[in-house]
């Protein structure tokens, strides 16, 4: 697997595009473990973001019934078409953040770090069964952070409102070529049962986490404009606001939902939350 990767690199005299975050995973054991973690069968349709030189794609094609691979680099698309003859892989040229995703039930990817956040939020708006993803370690640690933790963020809250998330393996920099400046981690995401998923108003979450160390009352006053209202209107309702004196970074998804319901019931929030994983 590793020899195959480097033979392609030398054959085409490739230089990774750092703008696109190209760092190729070169440790076969990690690739094999991630494919195993995905629990694939011929019934599965897998989405891969950033197939690069196709090492992971090749393994996915052997286990899944169908694989869609979205690649932004036209050079990589051409190389993959020349080097492989996959009967069940469809390559899609485009920016994974912008293009429409095909239907899939599992995602397995070594994500380009600079699109980790938008891809994750986009994933949470789709139906899926399991995702096995490689992220920058710091990003992965934010995904699993609990309320009150130093790393707890908007990302932590939005992910945990809809999915169970587990950091299952840390990966050193030497596992990639070229060697990145940061460590990485494997994260497994599984949607929560439908009755346990919490749909939150994204504008409200953004407004709160603009001031994550402030109290809820203070954060809402500072970010009133993001909710389409003003400080005075918000201030009039603060005395009965749920969790008003809690720090934003201490809020659980359930507590943010309490705040959302209160604001909506009092006419201070009109936009409905975006649906996903329904």
UniProtKB/Swiss-Prot annotation:
- Return the EC number: 2.1.1.-
Which InterPro entries does the record associate with it?
KsgA/Erm, rRNA_Ade_diMease-like_C, rRNA_Ade_Mease_Trfase_CS, rRNA_Ade_methylase_Trfase_N, rRNA_adenine_dimethylase, SAM-dependent_MTases_sf
Q: Which domain of life is it from?
A: Archaea
At which positions is S-adenosyl-L-methionine bound? Answer: 23, 25, 50, 71, 95, 110
Going by the record, the broad EC class of this enzyme is transferase
Localization (cell): Cytoplasm
GO cellular component terms attached to this protein's record: cytoplasm
Q: Which GO terms describe its molecular function?
A: RNA binding; rRNA (adenine-N6,N6-)-dimethyltransferase activity
Gene3D superfamilies named among the record's database cross-references: Ribosomal RNA adenine dimethylase-like, domain 2 (1.10.8.100), Vaccinia Virus protein VP39 (3.40.50.150)
Q: Which family does it belong to?
A: Belongs to the class I-like SAM-binding methyltransferase superfamily. rRNA adenine N(6)-methyltransferase family. RsmA subfamily.
Please give the name of this protein. Probable ribosomal RNA small subunit methyltransferase A
Highest lineage ranks of the organism? Archaea, Methanobacteriati, Methanobacteriota, Thermococci, Thermococcales
| Gene that encodes the chain | rsmA
